[in-house]
Amino acid sequence: WKRGADAEKWDSWVRVHNGTRIANWHGVISFSAGSLLGLLVLMATHTLWILGVAAPLVMLGYLYNAGPRPLSYTQLGEWATGVCYGGVFACLWLLAGKPFGAAALAGAFAFAAFAVALLLSHQPPQIATDRAAGKHSFAVRYGTERTIIVARGLFAFALVSLAANLWLGGLRGMGTLVFGLAA
């Protein structure tokens, strides 16, 4: 908000609450509660070693939004999104006690592609304001048409990756067929 992106949105917490104080507290409380809950789950399941994978993802998520030059303002914003969401899937896969293999990798790619496709799908209407705020998002760099094409391609890739995850993970036959037809 301080950097000018999304300032035109009238329903933002910053505008509704006349400043960043409430939004900052909301972020601190949400982050603290999520971290505590996640740590309790890892302790209960005796999988604290997953913190070795999860902690860098948390730091990457923080850097995406905070600091003097957030990653969301750079050309790395979309990559950071994909790495974080793919990594979260991998952590959840490991937490479920499944061995990391081709199915996990396909699922991580699916989550990453879904996340980036969703991010890209929201960028075209914000090109002018993002450019004015100094953001270097994919849409600012490549324009509306290319952004939409890439978002659709990532969505299709995500569906194929998810089907591969289901197939490789043991859901064969009718379940995978129904999912494939629905996609």
Predicted ranges, named:
Residues 31, 57-61, 111, 155-158, ...:
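Residue-level recognition of pore/gate-forming positions within transmembrane alpha-helices
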Residues 167-183:
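Extended hydrophobic alpha-helices typical of membrane-associated regions
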